[in-house]
Amino acid sequence: SLLFSSNCKYRSTETTGPAQQRLEFRQGFFGIYDALWNAINLRNDLQHFQDGLFIWDIPTFSEEAIREAILNAVSHRDYRSAGSVFVRQYPRKLEIVSPGGLPQGITPENILWHQYPRNRRIAEAFARCGLVERSGQGMNRIYEECIRTNKPKPDFRGTDAYNVNLTLSGEVQDPQFLRFLEKVGRERLKSFSTKDFLIVDFAYRGRPIPGDLKERVPFLIEEGVIEKIGRDKYTLSRQFFQ
């Protein structure tokens, strides 16, 4: 059994002082994986949005993204360090800090395209147990879920040679984008790759599409999801805003 040491704290504000709740887990990981999520979910507020007759509630913390982030912290941490994995929850964001910096050659900029599992056997065990669909794809799923729920992409500020600091914001940025994705359709979104989601996000924000993503642009144009509006400029398709 994989032994796991974690501290989970909840703070209602970011000011210094004692946490409102603090839980410590020091046992086999499979025995506390659900308990850790359940503790987070106790303070997982729903954000309510309405646009005409269109009404929906979005959890502040996506279960899929949070679970993937925990699995990443456990499978990629440096076990030569005696430190624990820390989970710090605030009303609108969650931080996960794991011992050991990013593996050699991995940066926040290339983390989606360069997989280097520090503990391959743990990652493979998670895949065999069905906790992850495919070893090495956890961060991709986190990015996709952040875009799908219109929340800021993962933030690695505070990461250094000794710790990986991952912050996931729970703040929904634009309900109109959520409605756009709803009209695109869940079945269609299931066929999207990580690159497809990133392109849609760049088009939504009016930013140039990076060169390493452009190979997927024709597919999204053919699907009617984005439109070209100038040289190297794209926008979300107008048909889904009507």
Predicted features along the sequence, with ranges:
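C-terminal regulatory or interaction extensions
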Residues: S1-Q242
